[in-house]
């Protein structure tokens, strides 16, 4: 890319890598230089990601850290590939969560929102948002997010509010929004309907009670965990194929306590094997019962108010809390002899409000709904016909399972903070919907409810680009390129964006690819939760190990759609990797590595240089392909092992003799080239350390505005690869020999290499001697080892105590033979074999194999010792 001029920063690197010293400085440098900004007028091809907007109340958790690492990785890579890359940031107003925060502040001074009134309360929330909200935005900077801050959006911004009003009116005019009584999730504490995603299902130890309905003429026994709701029963249901109850279908039965006659109906929904096979139908207080009740015309009897208190039953239970009423109803039924079977423990999942942990009450309520059938079909078709691709593909069935079976979406919330529903009611029952810049006639009152937070966030991919106006941003950056998010909100958010995007944008999908990642779990694979005490704070990890270490750890564990475990030791390991890279660059600079000038022709380079360049091309090609396929874990693993193993452990060590010699220039240029390309390749994952090292190595302005590395697989040098492979075999065998002989790895010994000429390695004896710390000072070579055609002889004089070593090996050999013989005797004993358990026999056989191998190894070591 153009514009990456020499910045004159090519100075000596510090001896140690200290993340805290570089991260804030580099992020400010990038932001001040405008590197994150995207230009809608650019001729470059677009690449767009809109950030899943975190709640304004939130702070960075480990799931965010993974999500943002992947998005930043893709954005930085595409920017380096020449795309006009836009990563658009923002926050969600988080209706119920934010309202709860401010209400708690008011409660602390003895006030409620009703004391302030609606307008004053909303102003109070805005004030809180400006003063305390958005903590996560500063934490995003800590992580290194290269977002276009000039485009930061908020779901309550004026233009996004305009988008909400526009699409609400369009949906209403298409008869895709309607008002009706339905069963919804109701929080008796927050006093609002809440979405499915705001309901946490927890196992609850309830109690099954079997109750006899009816009299001597007609009676039937039902089983329930919610005895209090029987006061609102409208029917009893059985399966039509259940022979036990066929004769009762169509008859009426007496409902105890309220003395109301209710019908016995037959419905396929009833499981004849569950409980007694007969269920009570409380159509106003259970979602399944409501659907069944609609099919059979069952009476809707409301027995509870919005606070979860019994009301309107005409019994002594009115005024009781629902849970107190449950106990009281069972006790009264027992007195009447109606309890057929006493309480039986029953564990089942019960919904709780995510915000306040109150048990959710299914409630019949008049709410606003989106008719999802045509919208969901369009969302399904977009994936089925290939316009939108889901990664990994095996997640597609889960997507279709949801969109093909969606219920209408309840979008109204009984809150004050949020987008107020733009519906107005006239004095004579008129209903009108006002779009942006429209006002209701005098005398009309607006619906008091606000829209579900997910309604406005469903518009995020296009509302943030200026819709409903036909903006340059919308033309350039929509559809967005990829949506990166966890599979856990595939239904709640992703599907809703698909539906709204396709509807608003005339069939244009909101994104081309849905890239789903898994959840971050603890090191044992358990889900993180405050109750388990296994949550982790990414900020603490960044403070301790640096942002790059956390990012690399998360990316290295990110397999598409698969959960990953996280342990602090692994982040420490990534910090060690960063330190390894830092030290390698420092070594390179101290040894004259350069990026100036052309590389020598491959034919003029030695085998070690050709090998590392060949490996570099292979790694660049493979890593690039893996990144594009969202195989981040595999790409990071590949880069890690190339950098640590091939570059640092092999190339640098094998080349030290060359760097110290008179013919170092070509190798210095090769080392500079390899580091240059590796730092580019790693930059999207570890942006801070790579920027610092690359600028120091090259003296140029920024790695962010340079080109992505390209591979040249046509220059592969297989002969050099084979030569270096042979060197690696020699080094590995000699190191093993030294270890077997108890010779310290740092100790120098005399050695003689025989046969290097036969395998083309004569010129590389200095490199082998350097890496193996082998001198050529002796003629008393008394021990040897062989690798193919190459023999290495050693003078062990002074290196080890030969008498003590021979004694140790002989003692170990005798012990191994004794163990072997003992195992053989047992295995040859037919009586023992007939009675011994299989696991014992297997263990003895394994011991025989191991001792036989030990005998072979120890015998060989003794033979190699000088006589």
Where in the sequence are the language-model features?
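Residue patterns forming the tRNA-binding/recognition surfaces of aminoacyl-tRNA synthetases
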Residues: 2-5, 11, 16, 25, ...
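Amphipathic alpha-helical blocks
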Residues: 21-39, 241-242
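N-terminal catalytic cores of NTP/NDP-binding nucleotidyl/phosphoryl-transfer enzymes
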Residues: 39-102, 164, 223-225, 229, ...
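Secondary-structure transition/capping motifs at alpha-helix termini
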Residues: 76-84, 105-118, 138, 142-147, ...
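Active-site-adjacent "gating/activation" loops or surface patches in catalytic cores
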Residues: 260-265, 448-478, 645, 649-652
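Short, solvent-exposed turn/loop segments enriched in Gly/Ser/Thr/Pro and often Arg
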Residues: 42-44, 52-53, 86-99, 152-160, ...
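Feature 926 captures the class I aminoacyl-tRNA synthetase adenylation module centered on the KMSKS loop
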Residues: 3, 210, 401-455, 459, ...
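Catalytic alpha/beta core of large soluble enzyme barrels
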Residues: 84, 227-307, 330, 334, ...
């Amino acid at each position: 890319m153009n514009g990456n001029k020499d910045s004159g920063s090519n100075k000596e690197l510090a001896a140690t890598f200290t993340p805290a010293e570089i991260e804030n400085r580099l992020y400010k440098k990038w932001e001040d230089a405008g590197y994150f900004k995207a230009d809608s007028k650019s001729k470059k091809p677009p690449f767009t990601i809109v950030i899943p907007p975190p709640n304004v109340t939130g702070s960075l958790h480990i799931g965010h850290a993974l999500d943002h690492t992947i998005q930043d990785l893709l954005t930085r890579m595409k920017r380096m590939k020449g795309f006009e890359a836009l990563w658009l940031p923002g926050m969600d107003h988080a209706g119920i969560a934010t309202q709860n925060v401010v209400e708690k502040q008011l409660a602390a001074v003895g006030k409620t929102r009703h004391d302030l009134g609606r307008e004053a309360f909303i102003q109070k929330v805005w004030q809180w948002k400006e003063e305390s909200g958005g903590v996560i935005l500063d934490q995003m900077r800590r992580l290194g997010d290269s977002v276009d801050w000039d485009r930061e959006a908020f779901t309550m911004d004026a233009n996004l509010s305009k988008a909400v009003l526009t699409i609400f009116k369009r949906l209403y005019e298409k008869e895709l929004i309607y008002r009706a009584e339905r069963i919804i999730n109701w929080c008796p504490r927050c006093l609002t309907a809440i979405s499915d995603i705001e309901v946490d299902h927890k196992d609850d130890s309830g109690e099954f009670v079997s109750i006899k309905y009816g009299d001597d003429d007609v009676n039937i026994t039902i089983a329930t965990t919610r005895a209090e709701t029987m006061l609102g029963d409208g029917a009893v249901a059985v399966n039509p194929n259940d022979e036990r109850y066929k004769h009762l279908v169509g008859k009426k039965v007496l409902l105890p306590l309220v003395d109301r006659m209710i019908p016995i109906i037959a419905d396929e929904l009833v499981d004849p094997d569950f409980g007694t096979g007969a269920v009570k139908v409380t159509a106003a207080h259970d979602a399944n019962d409501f659907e069944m009740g609609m099919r059979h015309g069952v009476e809707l009897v409301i027995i509870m108010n919005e606070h979860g208190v019994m009301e309107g039953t005409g019994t002594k239970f009115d005024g009781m809390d629902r849970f107190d009423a449950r106990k009281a109803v069972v006790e009264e039924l027992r007195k009447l002899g109606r309890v057929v079977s006493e309480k039986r423990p029953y564990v089942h999942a019960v919904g709780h409000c995510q915000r306040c942990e109150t048990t959710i009450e299914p409630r019949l309520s008049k709410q606003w709904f989106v008719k999802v059938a045509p919208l969901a079909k369009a969302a399904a078709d977009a994936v089925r016909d290939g316009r939108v691709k889901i990664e990994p593909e095996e997640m597609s069935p889960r997507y279709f399972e949801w969109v093909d079976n969606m219920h209408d979406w309840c979008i109204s919330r009984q809150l004050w903070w949020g987008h107020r529903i733009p519906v107005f009611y006239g004095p004579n029952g008129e209903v009108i919907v006002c779009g942006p810049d429209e006002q209701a006639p005098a005398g009309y009152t607006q619906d008091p409810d606000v829209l579900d937070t997910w309604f406005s966030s469903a518009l995020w991919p296009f509302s943030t680009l200026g819709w409903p106006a036909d903006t340059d941003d919308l033309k350039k950056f929509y559809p967005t390129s990829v949506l990166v998010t966890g599979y856990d909100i595939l239904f709640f958010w992703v599907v809703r964006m698909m539906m709204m995007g396709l509807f608003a944008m005339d069939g244009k999908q909101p994104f081309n690819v849905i890239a789903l990642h898994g959840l971050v779990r603890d090191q044992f694979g358990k889900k993180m939760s405050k109750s388990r005490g296994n949550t982790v704070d990414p900020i603490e990890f960044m403070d301790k190990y640096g942002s790059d270490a956390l990012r690399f750890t998360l990316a290295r564990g990110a397999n598409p759609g698969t959960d990953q475990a996280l342990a602090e030791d692994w982040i420490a390991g990534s910090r060690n990797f960063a330190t390894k890279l830092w030290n390698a660059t420092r070594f390179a600079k101290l040894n004259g590595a350069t990026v100036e000038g052309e590389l020598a022709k491959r034919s003029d380079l030695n085998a070690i240089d050709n090998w590392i360049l060949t490996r570099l091309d292979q790694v660049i090609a493979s890593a690039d392909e893996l990144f594009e396929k969202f195989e981040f874990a595999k790409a990071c693993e590949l880069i890690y092992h190339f950098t640590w193993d091939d570059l640092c452990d092999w190339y640098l060590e094998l080349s030290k003799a060359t760097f110290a010699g008179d013919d170092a220039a070509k190798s210095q240029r090769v080392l500079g080239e390899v580091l240059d390309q590796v730092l580019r390749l790693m930059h999207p994952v570890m942006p801070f350390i790579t920027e610092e090292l690359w600028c120091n190595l090259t003296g140029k302005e920024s790695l962010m505005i340079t080109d992505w590395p390209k591979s040249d697989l046509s220059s592969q040098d297989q002969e050099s690869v084979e030569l270096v492979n042979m060197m690696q075999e020699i080094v590995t065998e000699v190191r093993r020999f030294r270890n077997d002989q108890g010779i310290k790895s740092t100790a120098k010994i005399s050695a003689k290499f025989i046969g290097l000429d036969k395998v083309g390695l004569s010129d590389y004896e200095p490199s082998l001697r350097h890496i193996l710390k082998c001198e050529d000072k002796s003629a008393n070579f008394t021990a040897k080892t062989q690798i193919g055609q190459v023999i290495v002889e050693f003078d062990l004089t002074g290196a080890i105590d030969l008498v003590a070593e021979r004694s140790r090996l002989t003692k170990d050999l005798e012990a191994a033979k004794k163990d072997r013989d003992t195992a053989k005797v047992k295995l040859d004993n037919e009586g023992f074999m007939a009675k011994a358990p299989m696991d014992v026999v297997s263990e003895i056989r394994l011991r025989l194999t191991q001792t036989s191998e030990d005998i072979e190894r120890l015998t060989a070591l003794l033979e190699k010792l000088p006589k």
